[in-house]
């Protein structure tokens, strides 16, 4: 039978009475997709009917209603405006082993939230430029054409003036912050911006993320409205405390690729630098001026495109480029950005040749070789080579060399000097046995049941299926279940991303 999400049972009046609280925390969970298996349905991208019924009921019964989104990506949040009395929403992501404790600390006020969205959350699914091209929606499960070109995520929403539900870089806090531009400088190819960040609140400590965006001039090459070039997170600031945050980016971060001559270039014009705390809450803080085109890198075409994909283009002048303007909309922002004198914004003239041009040469690929590798390669048959490339998958006795593993390369070539590589199914190590025992015959068995139904089996059967926990030869295979990439990036620490 097809897998069904465990949406949960109906919440009853009896549950409300037993809870003895005025606050309800309702968690919405979805698994990540793979192999084009996600569907645009109310049960996957949106609420299941039982979830909608439960949310409506709980919002009526409790004074405070918190919704936690335990999903690895975007989710349809239209219900926030359709169901009254929902007070707060937390994007949990998929945080791994300590995720529950982290959310509890946030809800209880032990820590102040400081994460920032790494994706733009649209009001409607069709607001995404590639919405109709995804998976089965265009009838093609085998090929995906990236027609968005450079207009991906916030670069699309900001350029095409599509109002998102939550913009890129957005995230609320229990306190309020103020950013004050302290200065901007240019040293060779490094642009440096200093920003004083102050916690204006009176109760909570908190952290803020300073974000730098640059609007590049349109020329022969079309540009997005703005691009993120740098970000930095403050320390935990106490109420009234202030910290100077220094951010840097390189002029090479402003280049664009020109396909016709395989060149990376800076086109002439004004590069407008912005500071803020999301892509929709920025102020102009400086201008970089370039008089003539600057080529920074030269490449060569080595792979001919098999077909030409018609990419999305923005034909009008970008409104966000006005040097004395800003990009601010009311997203319940908790950060005021102060520029003392908009009329005296610093400008810097970029000198020709400030970036040395680099020519890339693509010669024959260097292949590592030694007597040992030559001997191994000469011993391989055509079948051996095919098996080495394709891998052994999840079938055959070799799969059980690490019980519960997600796949192997191949264990059939160990006699020829090629070891078998056994893989876990992601950081969570799904199905992977933490402890296994090795018998005197070399057979490996997991010590603990990794499937729940096994605990109901008769003891003699379990004894045959499982390894001996008292064996002197035990193998340990632990996994961390660390947060998924979107959750790590949301922390906004550069050393994590």
Segments predicted by a language model, with ranges:
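C-terminal non-catalytic regions of proteins with extracellular/luminal or membrane-system context
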Residues: 1-417, 422-492, 496
């Amino acid at each position: 039978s097809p897998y069904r999400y465990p949406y949960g049972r109906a919440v009853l009046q009896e549950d409300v009475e037993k809870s003895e609280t005025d606050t309800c925390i309702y968690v919405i969970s979805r698994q990540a997709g793979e192999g084009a298996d996600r569907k645009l349905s109310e049960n996957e991208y949106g609420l299941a009917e039982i979830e909608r019924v439960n949310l409506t009921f709980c919002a009526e019964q409790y004074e405070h209603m918190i919704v936690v989104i335990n999903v690895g990506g975007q989710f349809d949040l239209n219900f926030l405006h359709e169901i009254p009395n929902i007070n707060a929403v937390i994007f949990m992501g998929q945080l791994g082993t300590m995720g529950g404790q982290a959310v509890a600390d946030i809800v209880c006020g032990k820590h102040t939230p400081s994460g920032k969205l790494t994706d733009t959350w649209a009001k409607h699914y069709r607001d995404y430029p590639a919405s109709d091209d995804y998976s089965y929606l265009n009838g093609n499960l085998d090929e995906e054409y990236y027609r968005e070109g450079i207009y991906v995520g916030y670069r699309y929403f900001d350029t095409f003036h599509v109002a998102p539900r939550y913009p890129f870089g957005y995230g609320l806090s229990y306190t309020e912050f103020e950013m004050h531009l302290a200065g901007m400088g240019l040293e060779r190819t490094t642009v440096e911006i200093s920003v004083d960040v102050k916690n204006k609140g009176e109760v909570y400590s908190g952290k803020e993320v300073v974000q730098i965006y640059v609007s590049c001039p349109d020329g022969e090459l079309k540009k997005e409205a703005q691009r993120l070039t740098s970000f930095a997170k403050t320390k935990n600031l106490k109420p009234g405390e202030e910290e100077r945050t220094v951010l840097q980016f390189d002029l090479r971060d402003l280049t664009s690729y020109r396909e016709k001559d395989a060149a990376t270039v800076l086109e002439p014009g004004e590069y407008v630098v912005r500071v803020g705390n999301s892509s929709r809450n920025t102020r102009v803080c400086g201008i970089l001026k370039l008089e003539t085109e600057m080529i920074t890198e030269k490449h060569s075409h080595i792979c001919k495109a098999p077909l030409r994909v018609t990419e999305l283009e923005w034909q009008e002048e970008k409104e966000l480029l006005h040097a004395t303007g800003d990009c601010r909309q009311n997203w319940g922002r908790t950060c005021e950005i102060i520029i003392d004198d908009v009329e005296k914004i610093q400008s810097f003239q970029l000198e020709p040749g400030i970036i040395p041009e680099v020519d890339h040469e693509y010669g024959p690929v260097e292949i590592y070789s030694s007597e040992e590798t030559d001997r191994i390669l000469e011993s391989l048959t055509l079948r051996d080579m095919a098996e080495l490339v394709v891998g052994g998958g999840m079938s055959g006795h070799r799969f059980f060399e690490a019980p519960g593993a997600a796949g192997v390369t191949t264990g059939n070539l160990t006699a020829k000097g090629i070891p078998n590589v056994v893989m876990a199914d992601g950081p969570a190590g799904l199905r992977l046995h933490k402890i296994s025992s090795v018998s005197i015959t070399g057979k490996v068995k997991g010590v603990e049941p990794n499937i729940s139904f096994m605990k109901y089996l008769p003891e003699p059967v379990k004894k045959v299926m499982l390894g001996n926990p008292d064996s002197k030869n035990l193998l340990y295979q632990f996994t961390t279940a660390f947060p998924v990439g979107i959750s790590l990036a949301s922390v906004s620490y550069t050393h994590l991303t």
